[in-house]
């Protein structure tokens, strides 16, 4: 870690279609091997497909799916006197959305037998409806934090 102050974060420009930084970040996460136009096509078509199936605006579906999938609390390992405790801590908003996007994408990639557009659309719909693998992952993280609630006081040292 550098000792000379904080690192300045590069601002991510919003995407062209929805003028949203969140959508742009999601496109960047979907992108593989620098193929951004392909990633954009996948994300936009998946959002269109989800909107068509749910009969709701694309951005509403995307934002609600992200909100539903984002964890509010997680566990972090903390070493105290030779023992490592899983300490529950609150998740910062940047990391919250980043985890939600990562989990959505992992769940979509884990589904098989269909094109990525359909898998991603299905995962977005599931997250929007508070079901599916992504939501299960979030609930597992919350359950883990709840189970280790006794060690929460270590987080405030």
Swiss-Prot record:
Q: Which PANTHER family match?
A: RIBOSOMAL PROTEIN S7
What does the subunit section of this Swiss-Prot or TrEMBL entry state? Part of the 30S ribosomal subunit. Contacts proteins S9 and S11.
Upper classification of the source organism reads:
Bacteria, Bacillati, Chloroflexota, Chloroflexia, Chloroflexales
Could you give one GO CC term from the UniProt record? cytosolic small ribosomal subunit
* Function noted in UniProt: One of the primary rRNA binding proteins, it binds directly to 16S rRNA where it nucleates assembly of the head domain of the 30S subunit. Is located at the subunit interface close to the decoding center, probably blocks exit of the E-site tRNA.
Q: What is this protein called?
A: Small ribosomal subunit protein uS7
One Gene Ontology term from the biological process aspect of the record? translation
As one GO molecular function, the record gives: mRNA binding
Q: Which family does it belong to?
A: Belongs to the universal ribosomal protein uS7 family.
Q: Where does this protein have coiled-coil stretches?
A: none
**Which is a Pfam family this sequence falls into?**
Ribosomal_S7
- Which key words are in the record? Ribonucleoprotein, Ribosomal protein, RNA-binding, rRNA-binding, tRNA-binding
In terms of CDD domains, this protein maps to: uS7_Bacteria
Q: Does the keyword Ribonucleoprotein apply?
A: yes
All disulfide bonds of the chain are none
């Amino acid at each position: 870690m550098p000792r000379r102050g904080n690192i300045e974060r590069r601002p991510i420009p919003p995407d062209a279609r929805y003028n949203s930084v969140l959508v742009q970040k999601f496109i960047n996460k979907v992108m593989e091997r620098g193929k951004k136009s392909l990633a954009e096509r996948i994300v936009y078509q998946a959002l269109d497909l989800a909107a068509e199936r749910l009969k709701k605006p694309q951005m509403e579906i995307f934002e609600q799916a992200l909100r539903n999938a984002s964890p509010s609390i997680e566990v972090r390992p903390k070493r105290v006197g030779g023992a490592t405790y899983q300490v529950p801590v609150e998740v910062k908003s940047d990391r919250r959305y980043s985890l939600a996007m990562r989990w959505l994408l992992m769940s979509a990639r884990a589904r098989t037998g269909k094109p990525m557009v359909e898998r991603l659309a299905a995962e977005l719909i599931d997250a929007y409806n508070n079901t599916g693998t992504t939501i299960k992952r979030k609930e597992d993280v919350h359950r883990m934090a709840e189970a280790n609630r006794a060690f929460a006081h270590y987080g405030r040292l």
